């Protein structure tokens, strides 16, 4: 079993990487091989061997979100031998053990999770339209 995990952190968001990495190594599907693909404009000198830097510019908000899948296509050849590709937000820290069967479902090719800010009704998620697209002309 091998997991490819992406981290997105340009400018100050790269500061989340050390604790993010430590917690994923410790708590997220322990004892499973993980390779981290870090999309950043920052310096990763001295990083562990299981971190691969994916150089990107700081696009700024909201362009960063719009460029995510375009940038992820650069991983296609690098992750073809992995069992799963997972993206974990830079500011989302794993708090306790997450076992394989609790997170992955072999019967499904794709999956998504609800961001904690939505689940906890943090602004703007607690008011219409929240974070969901409500534009009737949208194909999202």
List PLM regions with ranges.
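General N-terminal targeting signals
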Residues: 22, 53, 69-70, 104, ...
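Cell wall/extracellular polymer interaction/catalysis modules
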Residues: 51-57, 121-135
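Glycine-rich, basic loop-to-helix element that forms the pyrophosphate-binding segment
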Residues: 63-73
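Catalytic core and acceptor-binding pocket of nucleotide-sugar-dependent glycosyltransferases
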Residues: 136-140
């Amino acid at each position: 079993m091998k997991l490819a995990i992406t981290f997105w952190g340009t400018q100050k968001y790269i500061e989340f990487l050390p604790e993010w990495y430590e917690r994923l190594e410790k708590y997220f599907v322990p004892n499973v091989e993980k390779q981290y693909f870090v999309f950043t404009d920052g310096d990763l000198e001295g990083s562990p061997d299981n971190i691969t830097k994916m150089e990107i510019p700081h696009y700024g908000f909201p362009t960063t979100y719009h460029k995510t899948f375009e940038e992820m296509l650069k991983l296609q050849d690098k992750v073809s031998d992995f069992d799963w590709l997972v993206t974990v937000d830079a500011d989302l820290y794993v708090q306790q053990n997450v076992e394989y069967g609790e997170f992955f479902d072999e019967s499904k090719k794709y999956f998504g999770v609800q961001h904690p800010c939505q689940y906890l009704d943090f602004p703007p998620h607690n008011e219409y339209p929240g974070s969901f697209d409500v534009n009737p002309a949208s194909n999202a």
